């Protein structure tokens, strides 16, 4: 509510879709333009195309080292972003600066990212989108699960539910642990109800081929993949299917396990998991516990959320706390 109130004060009109809030214009650039307009109104100096190479605390504040010149500052807010999507400007250099100032970094991995599958059984079904539940299984244990539109690609799996569980897979792979994803391609049915459905479909249609057995349920590109994994030939007649074969088909559909080889890289990730340890930050001000008047905010810290605006909210909330605290501290020191 505070975030909405802040942006409303800048002139942003919003609308809600379910539990999510969007600019009424449906343009992300509207938010950026309003922020830039407010900076102009407040006569805030903005310097671009400068690379910060280091920050040195002094007795009166900080010296900022850049590829152009040295600058002085009373306070520093590090809000450099992580390593995700570096073409937008966040190349991970903020981590090095924070480490030089004494902070500890939790290993960083891509998050909200696509997954590459080893010996991909659905490569020939690339382009298919289907409702599914995906579960990250890390080191033999379920870690996270999500339900939504699964996208099959030539190299692996994608889509919002895959993004939601990807951080757990990435962490597991970083630790050299086994990482798999269990896919339920028919979450509307239990194993028992799907088995009964297939039994009824078999009875009375004994001359139907297995190529047509799953028509009306799944995308045509998925059917041969399922049958292949269940070791059922496409031209087999349904009347020749045993109950054991049907149970095998049910398992392929309801508990399809793929092994993850790796994630896509940071440039394909929406955010990072990992970053500067939050234990080294005062939570109500975002000030460093090690360096006075140094503040850290946003994705630079070891906090990441699922899709749905949570990472944006973290950036805005911590930025607000850091900015307010920095201004108050500087004013009180003068």
Task: State the predicted function of each range.
Residues 1-45:
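Conserved N-terminal/central alpha/beta ligand/cofactor-binding core
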Residues 13, 104-107, 113-240:
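An anion/pyrophosphate-binding glycine-rich loop and adjacent beta-alpha core
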Residues 18-37, 85-89, 118-120, 238-245:
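Short beta-strand to alpha-helix junction loop
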Residues 47, 65-75, 145-148:
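Core beta-strand elements of the Rossmann-like FAD/NAD(P) dinucleotide-binding domain
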Residues 47-48, 224-304:
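A glycine-rich dinucleotide-binding beta-alpha-beta segment and adjacent secondary-structure elements
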Residues 48-61:
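A conserved short coil-to-beta-strand element within the FAD-binding core of flavoproteins
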Residues 52-53, 70-90, 98-99, 150-158, ...:
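Short hydrophobic core segments
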Residues 82-101, 303-330:
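A conserved FAD-binding loop/helix module that cradles the flavin
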């Amino acid at each position: 509510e505070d975030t909405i109130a802040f942006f409303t004060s800048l002139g942003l009109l919003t609308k809600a879709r379910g539990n999510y809030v969007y600019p009424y214009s449906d343009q992300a650039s509207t938010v950026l333009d309003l922020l830039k307009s407010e900076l102009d109104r407040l006569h805030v100096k903005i310097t671009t195309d400068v690379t910060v190479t280091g920050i040195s605390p002094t007795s009166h504040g900080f010296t900022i080292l850049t590829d152009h010149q040295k600058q002085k500052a009373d306070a520093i807010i590090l809000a450099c972003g992580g390593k995700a999507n570096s073409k937008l400007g966040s190349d991970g250099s903020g981590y090095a600066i924070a480490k030089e100032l004494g902070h500890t970094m939790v290993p960083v991995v891509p998050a909200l990212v696509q997954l590459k599958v080893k010996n991909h059984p659905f490569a020939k079904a690339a382009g298919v989108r289907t409702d599914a539940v995906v579960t990250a299984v890390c080191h033999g244990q379920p870690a996270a699960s999500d339900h939504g539109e699964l996208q099959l690609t030539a190299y692996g799996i994608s889509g919002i539910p895959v993004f939601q569980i990807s951080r757990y897979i990435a962490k597991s792979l970083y630790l050299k642990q086994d990482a798999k994803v269990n896919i339920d391609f028919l979450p509307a049915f239990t194993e028992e109800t799907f088995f009964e459905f297939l039994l009824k479909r078999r009875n009375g249609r004994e001359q139907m081929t297995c190529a047509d057995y799953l028509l009306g349920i799944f995308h045509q590109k998925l059917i041969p993949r399922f049958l292949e994994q269940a070791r059922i030939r496409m031209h087999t007649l349904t009347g020749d299917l045993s109950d054991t074969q049907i149970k095998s088909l049910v398992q392929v559909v309801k508990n399809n396990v793929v092994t993850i080889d790796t994630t896509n890289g940071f440039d394909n990730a929406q955010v990072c998991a990992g970053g500067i340890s939050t234990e080294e930050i005062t939570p109500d001000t975002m000030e460093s516990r090690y360096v006075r008047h140094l503040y850290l905010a946003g994705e630079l810290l070891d906090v990441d959320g699922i899709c749905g605006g949570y990472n944006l909210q973290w950036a805005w909330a911590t930025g607000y706390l850091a900015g307010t605290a920095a201004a108050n501290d500087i004013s009180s020191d003068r």
